[in-house]
Amino acid sequence: MKVVNLKQAILQAWKERWSDYQWAINMKRFFPRGATWDILNLAEALLEQAMIGPSPNPLILSYLKYAISSQMVSYSTVLTAISKFDDFSRDLCVQSLLEIMDMFCDRLSCHGRAEECIGLCRALMSALNWLLRCAAFYAEKVKEMLEQVAAEGQMKMCLERLEKMLSSTKNRALIHIAQLEETSSWNAVEQSLLKLEESLNGLSNSTLRSQADDCISLIKSIPTMLSVRSEQLNKTGFPTVHAVVLLEGTMNLTGEIQPLVEQLMMVKRMQRIPPPLFMLEIWKACFVGLIESPEGTEELKWTAFTFLKIPQVLVELKNYPHGDKDFTEDVNCAFEFLLKLTPLLDKADQRCNCNCMSLLLQECSKQGLLSEANMTNLTDKRKADREDAPQLQSAENANIQPNPRLILRAEPTVTNILKTMDADHSKSPEGLLGVLGHMLSGKSLDLLLAAAAATGKLKSFAWKFIKLNEFTKHISTENSKSAPVRALLFDISFLMLCHVAQTYGSEVILSESRPADEVPFFETWMLTCMPEEGKILNPDHPCFRPDSTKVESLVALLNNSSEMKLVQINWHEVCLSISAAILEILNAWENSVLTFESIQKITDNIKGKVCSMAVCAVAWLVAHVRMLGLDEREKSLQMIRQLATPLYGDNTLQFYNERVVIMSSILEHMCADVLQQTATQIKFPSTGMDTIPYWNLLPPKKPIKEVLTSVFTKVLEKGWVDSRSIHIFDSLLHMGGVYWFCNNLVKELLKETRKEHTLRAVELLYAIFCLDMQQLTLTLLGHILPNLLTDSSKWHTLMDPPGKALAKLSVWCALSSYSSHNKGQASARQKKRHREDIEDYISLFPLDDTRPSKLMRLLSSNEEDANILSSPNRSMSSSLSASQLHAVSMRDPLNRVLANLFLLISSILGSKTAGTHTQFVQWFMEECVDCLEQGSHGSILQFMPFTMVSELVKVSTMSSPKIVLAITDLGLPLGRRVAAKAIAAL
């Protein structure tokens, strides 16, 4: 008999009562070649014929079961065929369909092409929708008294199948992919869910109801199945948070709030820190910083950071999603924990001469971070604790105003001063001078600057003083009465700007790019003439050699006058000419044309009225002394000494003593390096405080590698980083360079053999790397890791626990750098450092994917794989990643380094040589998954080649559906296909 179509063949088999295997043999004879059974829709044809009557045809059903068992038909076509049956009133038919699902629903798999695997995802979602509709139909039936028992039985069967299907993570993962692939079909599932929930309302059977509720909640969890994370509850100390806060308070008070908030949130997410403990750690770091800060400016900086900046940081943190938790409750809880640390609070109170906790609580309450009731409760508890410490009561000096109170008062004053500075200076220069004079008295200036820095107003503060400094150039209608006022306005603004640049970094002063003819005088002078740490000045630079006629008239003025005249003097020109004038005077002195008495008169003239002249003169002398031999320095140093000694007479201008204090501090900063190099002592007038804190911390005769090792060992023993250590690490990073610093710290990490020590080391190293996260990450991922992974003689160093710890550190650094890099957040401190040039990375990782990269040639240990990878005709598909589909720029060093690191990881996974380096790769990927932010398709995993997914699932610990979902970019159609193929094969 010639069979025309499938339906005829099935009917013939039924008529002749073929057995199932006989049917299969004959079918293959009827349809020998060509299309597969799925394309012929065999499963649907069999079901259609089997379900014609009120009860199913057992013989045709046996053919379908045989086809499923012998894999003639795929699971997806069977599920699709089942989901097309919608006459739920035929109970026996529904039962037999459920039995067919039982055959394979808990062990679904597909080893075909990616398209077939996506087909399985879609079919599974259709089957889920069918089961929901089925359950809803019987839930309605149960309410009819006549058919209640039968309907309950049917509904129970449906719910059991739903439970069985959904209890498998693999099935839920496949549905998750389908939901992203076909949103319209998922909408249909949601509609069926709503219908089932409505039908359950009148259901009296509690067992069925709870069973249905369980299924519903499982289905609702499918779209968010990646975002459920547990918090760490076994730890109470988090040294990374502590160190990040300390680093920011010590070195970056002027930094913007947002990058700090993002960095803290990144640490919180990566380390899974519960919110109350996270905030407790922030407060602990603030109090430790306050207690250990050196007296003077640093103490004021820390006070401003704690009482002004950190409450603002918490306000920003409040804006992040916190689930169903109340943020103010977490803040309250953190303060409750903090109250238990009585010794810490007592020490802070003693240092600050006030009840710090009370002031902090008021500030947080003002910002809406604490309720009134909680604030009162916490304040009362702290008050009671303080009564038990009599030394706090007696130690408090009623005459000394505590810094926290002064800082909180200074903050509104900053705003008022900024308004005053906006006024027209020409109308009332005397009034403005009065305000500035008041600012100079005592520690007012440092208080105001600290408050401005902590509230992000320092840049505009500096800009106002630059504008004032520029205003003093106008001298057209000047008389002897207005000349001293203009001289003082110039001098005070100049000194203040120098002081700001030295205390908070010159980047605070620098404005955004301007045309060359509009750059203010002070900015030009600071960039070209002002000595700073690590800046080498050329004393013969054109900036020190102005118009010779101006220099001659200035020399004559200084030498011949009994005192400096003020009327019609252009102070900007004087400051630029003074360096050349000093050179003339110095030459005359060295050639005995001038006597020491004449030099004294000249230096008195320089420093007697306008201190800025002395600052500019010393700036040039410092550059000059560096260039001289040991025996030639004496007279230059003597001149510095003369200029640094204040003039005590009646004939000085207003506010002279206040200006001298700032001048001395500026000169001490300028001369620090050169005095150390020449072993010279110059006594600067004492301002009653340590003017250069954290300066010159490195021991003079100890190799820097030993210093690095010993400081890191101490920090590791203590378990936290202190401010002094942060500054030492910063100096070592400057001195040794990024590669040296990173390489030696990684070596220290790999020496650790105890698990708890390695974890602590990672937490601390991550914080230390925050000194320059971008550059250290490039070095770690671009140089150090590839060297360790490609050199078989170093593989033993990657064993657990140090290898696992290094994997963790690498992922943390990669995630942080990538996140902040994409937001363009680099602190001013980091921007100042030498940037790695893109060329450094082009040579290591060529842009053109067809050229063999140096990194790939390093893979000497796996000959075949290395050859394939680096061969000129290597196909793009082996390295195609989501980042290329997202068109991420590979001109960027970080993107390039990440892409190549993942290529290397991919080649190690596919290699025939296994070892600790393979294990390292596994730890690296596990950590990536652990730290992943839900929905972050722009994460570092986008650089992973798609081909790597199938290699990864072969590793036992990575062969879970959730991990596959986490590591693939499900926002891309190709990403979904890769994920479906990998999960369906598990």
UniProtKB/Swiss-Prot annotation:
Keywords: Activator, Nucleus, Repeat, Transcription, Transcription regulation. A motif (LXXLL motif 1) lies at residues 128-132. A motif (LXXLL motif 5) lies at residues 785-789. A motif (LXXLL motif 2) lies at residues 341-345. A motif (LXXLL motif 4) lies at residues 554-558. One of its GO terms (biological process) is positive regulation of transcription initiation by RNA polymerase II. Belongs to the Mediator complex subunit 24 family. Component of the Mediator complex. This is Mediator of RNA polymerase II transcription subunit 24. It comes from Gallus gallus (Chicken). The gene is MED24.
